[in-house]
Amino acid sequence: MDIQETINQMGKKAAAAARAMRAASPSAKTSALLSLAQLIRQENKAITEANARDLAAAADRGLDAPRMDRLRLTDAVIEEMARACEFVAGLPDPIGATEKQWQRPNGLLVGKMRIPLGVISMIYESRPNVTVDSGILCLKAGNAVILRGGSEAFHSNMMLASLIHRALILAGLPQDAVQVVPSTDRGAIKALCELEEYIDVIIPRGGETLIRTVVADARMPVLKHYKGVCHAYVDEGADLEQACEIIFNAKVQRPGVCNALEGLLVHRSEAHTLLPAVAQKLGDAGVSFRACPRALPLLAPHGVPMAETDPGTEFHDLVMVVKVVDSQDEAQDYIAQHGSNHTEIICTRNHQNAMRFVREVDASMVAVNASSRFNDGGQLGLGAEIGISTSKLHSYGPMGVEELTTTKFVVLGNGQIRQ
């Protein structure tokens, strides 16, 4: 069977599973999630062995360090997946909830009820834990999902998919509610993008090339998890010791992820004090700086002149743009030009400046005196996320269970007809 036919058959199965999932009870979904948590812990060794095969093959192909980091499933990451299953199991079930209700003059009772999106396709790279996060969120929201992970994580993804299927069967739910494309053929991406007959929405999560390819080819709505070009602006009068800690965490903790810091904007009044401290603390951790002329001498010996192409670049590495600005206006203009609507930070003691930044800066998360690393479904209390949407429709920011649902109108009458 060629890849086109394989994807078509998966679409048919997913559509049938989505119909069954609309009738699934909250208790059945909870049972599946708790069973999956138990299976993940029980099968730690098998998961690690499958992941080791992927890591060895990736190393042979010369996969870069940030992608190797995202590919690796440590004991801590495996336990985190199990805990995510348990957390999502404990979340309120959104399906069937009536959000608004009002009565018309003719006696009609009108309401909006939350329902599943239907069939979702998720296309992603490197991170095998996304297989579990996506599967459990779609399951909790009553959807069916077709997952196409990166070829570098193939064995890990198939192992995790087998555990999800076992959990679904144990709970009496259709195992086709979560399917993983059983092939590394890149033609699967195009085939999924063309399957509008069965797929209601497609979510790409990965590099810029993948996102642009899916947006160009998809015949159904796309929820984009676009690149993360995140900035911190350090305001005049900010707590500089606190700001330095925030900048360090946001850049150094995991430089290859989408909520890592890529640019630092410093008010001119604070540059001579803050930037030497940043150079020492982050420089000692291996960070190099692409700096504007005013920042460069303050970052010695870790800085180089900023190139024209550096602003707006997602480095995925221990590299950061640094610019001295004359005002908050200049900082916000820079962010508007070079940001990616992902995450933006202001470090400030000035409440008025903070609220202005929150109100005017266009990003899926704006943080005041906190790290960009908090733009994450688990960190924000969603349990897990299927991605961080940088689109405003249908969701903006981390997409948890509720973001994978929509609403329909429900009208209750007693014989009314339109006059």
Swiss-Prot record:
It comes from the Bacteria. Its EC number is 1.2.1.41. It comes from Oleidesulfovibrio alaskensis (strain ATCC BAA-1058 / DSM 17464 / G20). Its main location: cytoplasm. The keyword Transmembrane helix does not apply. This is Gamma-glutamyl phosphate reductase. It is found in: Cytoplasm. GO terms for cellular component: cytoplasm. GO terms for biological process: L-proline biosynthetic process. The gene is proA.
